[in-house]
Amino acid sequence: MNPYGPSRVPEGEVYRPDRLNRKATLVAIVGAAILAFAFALVLWMGLKQTNLPAFGPSNVTRAVASATIAAVLIVTGFLTWLWLRDEHQSNPRWELEDVKPRPKWRTALTYLASYLSPAALVVAVLAIPLSATRLYLDGISVDQGFRTQFLTRMADDIGLSDMNYIDMPTFYPAGWFWLGGRLANLLGLPGWEAFQPWAIVSMAVAASVLVPVWQRITGSLPVATGIALVTTCIILAMNSEEPYAAIVAMGIPAMLVLASRIAKGDKFALAGGIIYLGVSATFYTLFTGAIALSAVAVCIVVAAIVQRSIKPLLWLAVLGGGSIVIALISWGPYLLASINGAERSGDSATHYLPLEGTQFPVPFLASSVVGLLCLVGLIYLVVRFHNNEVRAMWVGIAVFYAWMGMSMAITLLGNTLLGFRLDTVLVLIFATAGVLGIADFRLASVYQLYPTQITERTATHLTNLIVVLVLLGGLYYAQDLPQKNARAIDLAYTDTDGYGERADLYPAGAARYYKDINDHLLDQGFEPSETVVLTDELDFMSYYPYRGYQAFTSHYANPLGEFGNRNAFIEDLAIRSWDELADPQQFSDALNTSPWTIPEVFIFRGSIDDPDAGWKYDVAEDLYPNNPNVRFRGVYFNPESFDQMWQTKQVGPFVVVTHNE
């Protein structure tokens, strides 16, 4: 992004000394992705051979993570300083003589460090603190249980099946999970255990790919590296527990810039935009919808105000059509089922309004390093408003704030747009603008402000000062990232994993009995992927690829699964089991009236030795607009209903009921 038009570039200014051509850009993106994938995966595997203590009760892991973060940033910062020194000396502004060319070995080393530094940061912040546990951030708690269940499903089934219900296409975007399932198969890991390495590796790849992308956009390797590292730090602080969403968010600032170029007919930018929007739609639709709306707004502004032509709208149509084709890989089966008249009910994915969803974020007023960087970004966006690509960023900011406002407004209609999730995106945009603002000041603005006072020596000192301040600010912020994620890391150690163990070596919870339940079901001849189970033990479904008769909550349930109707059917069975359905045959007949594939297995909380207490199943109810928005209410089944045609077995606190057939 050159902040000037061609006629306004200061004499001798070189703002794009490292710009990649199209072929080099493609090679760099593919190369960065492959290198980051191998780099992160090998380091993750190596860390699994170490014996670091659990993160919570010991500071050893924190110290190792901080030292690694510092090493990554210092090495990258030093090589960047050398690169900027070379760039400064070769700048025709100074007319220096006998300038030595940059050594090829240092060029290669700087490229390697710059392209891999974001991946190394991901490893330092996540892989080191999680090295002694098999679980990822947040363990298996709350939303991570659903995500783990989906990855377990994708590792077991190469098709795009629903994470829970049998014989149903997925509603939740499957792209990230499907790829994670393939990595699980490659490594020979169960899906739940592959969640951690796939989250780390995929975010490392996305972070590293940002460097060549921004190098193409800005024409500067140091600026591209700075944006990638800042983006990685912010994502690791704000959204690392949801890796597929984090990956999409990383690319949003770049997509805003590309939207401006697409509107002008840049075919290379168009191809990149199609791939980004299409793939992002298979990863996380909320961010995709917001950035797609921004792209529409940018093209309309360019068509109506800048070019006064219909051409930008034609390019927009190509962008939309191409990305939709890619998106249909994931969304096609679900949309086809909906079009064919499949029943829908219980869709409440947008029924969530936390406190942060009631306020507009103003990151540039935060008293932090990132807040200061965002303030610099705000100043840059205001000062360089005449630049078309800066205007595109403003359009995106306006769209995201409007989305948040609409999300707050439509709460009156009993819904939201989950606007609070765009907080991260706004921080990324302003922080990215902050990096561009620093580069703009060093390369151009200072010479406009002080055209005669800035000598070659002064410019050198200014560059040195900026590098030192940026590096120290980055170190200060980045070394605190493991602590920012401390609660999520602690859950990865305190939750019981799929092998029935806690990584902190404390006694495991009730989930330690899941293996025994699975062994019992396998002994009975049940095939997990073909067996429908009624249970409120989400973690069991996260660790083993059984099919659920009911999803755990309506917020992640497939609308085609008719969550509300299933709840009513289950509760009716439970209530009537104490009356006319106490007879096993009548209970079986009533169960067979289910409009959906009936469960062959029930897993209850209760005791075989205390039949009068009943066997408990928790029904999940949507309480929106209240927060928390879910309530679990116990309904109890009469054990007498299972006296015949069913077998029962006590496994720890669970009663496992299996059909005789």
From Swiss-Prot:
One of its GO terms (molecular function) is glycosyltransferase activity. This is Galactan 5-O-arabinofuranosyltransferase. The lineage of its organism: Bacteria, Bacillati, Actinomycetota, Actinomycetes, Mycobacteriales. The chain crosses the membrane at residues 26-46, 64-84, 108-128, 194-214, 217-237, 243-263, 265-285, 286-306, 312-332, 362-382, 393-413, 418-438, 458-478. Involved in the biosynthesis of the arabinogalactan (AG) region of the mycolylarabinogalactan-peptidoglycan (mAGP) complex, an essential component of the cell wall. Belongs to the glycosyltransferase 85 family. Pfam families: AftA_C (PF12249), AftA_N (PF12250). It comes from Corynebacterium glutamicum (strain ATCC 13032 / DSM 20300 / JCM 1318 / BCRC 11384 / CCUG 27702 / LMG 3730 / NBRC 12168 / NCIMB 10025 / NRRL B-2784 / 534). Keywords: Cell membrane, Cell wall biogenesis/degradation, Glycosyltransferase, Membrane, Transferase, Transmembrane, Transmembrane helix. GO terms for cellular component: plasma membrane. It catalyses: Adds an alpha-D-arabinofuranosyl group from trans,octacis-decaprenylphospho-beta-D-arabinofuranose at the 5-O-position of the eighth, tenth and twelfth galactofuranose unit of the galactofuranan chain of [beta-D-galactofuranosyl-(1->5)-beta-D-galactofuranosyl-(1->6)]14-beta-D-galactofuranosyl-(1->5)-beta-D-galactofuranosyl-(1->4)-alpha-L-rhamnopyranosyl-(1->3)-N-acetyl-alpha-D-glucosaminyl-diphospho-trans,octacis-decaprenol. Disruption phenotype: Cells lacking this gene have a cell wall that shows a complete absence of arabinose resulting in a truncated cell wall structure possessing only a galactan core with a concomitant loss of cell wall-bound corynomycolic acids. Pathway: Cell wall biogenesis; cell wall polysaccharide biosynthesis. Its EC number is 2.4.2.46. GO terms for biological process: capsule polysaccharide biosynthetic process; cell wall macromolecule biosynthetic process; cell wall organization. It is found in: Cell membrane.
